[in-house]
Amino acid sequence: MVVIRLSRGGAKGRPFFNIVVADKRVRRDGRFIERLGFYNPTAKENEEGLRIMQDRLTYWKSVGAQSSPTVERLVKQAAKQMA
C-alpha cells in the first residue's frame, strides 16, 4: 500500500518534515517515491512553514494512496491559508 506521510529531517530540537509518498513497509525516513512538500513547525513569521503541491496530492489520492491523519490535518490547514 502507498501512503502519504511525514518524513523527519532537521537537527535535534529543530524538526523539519518532508511530506512524501512512500510504500507503507518502508521506514519513516527511508526511501520514498515522491516528495510533495514540506512542513516546518518552527518557522518564524517571515518564513514559509507549509507547502504542499495540491495537484500531485490529488493525483496520488486518485490512484489509491492513503494519507496519514497528520497529513490530512496539514492539508486542511494549507487550504485554510490559501482561502
From Swiss-Prot:
One of its GO terms (molecular function) is structural constituent of ribosome. The keyword NADP does not apply. PROSITE patterns: RIBOSOMAL_S16 (PS00732). This is Small ribosomal subunit protein bS16. Signal peptide: none annotated. It holds the Pfam family Ribosomal_S16. The keyword Ribonucleoprotein applies. Belongs to the bacterial ribosomal protein bS16 family. Keywords: Ribonucleoprotein, Ribosomal protein. InterPro entries: Ribosomal_bS16, Ribosomal_bS16_CS, Ribosomal_bS16_dom_sf. GO terms for cellular component: cytoplasm; small ribosomal subunit. One of its GO terms (biological process) is translation.
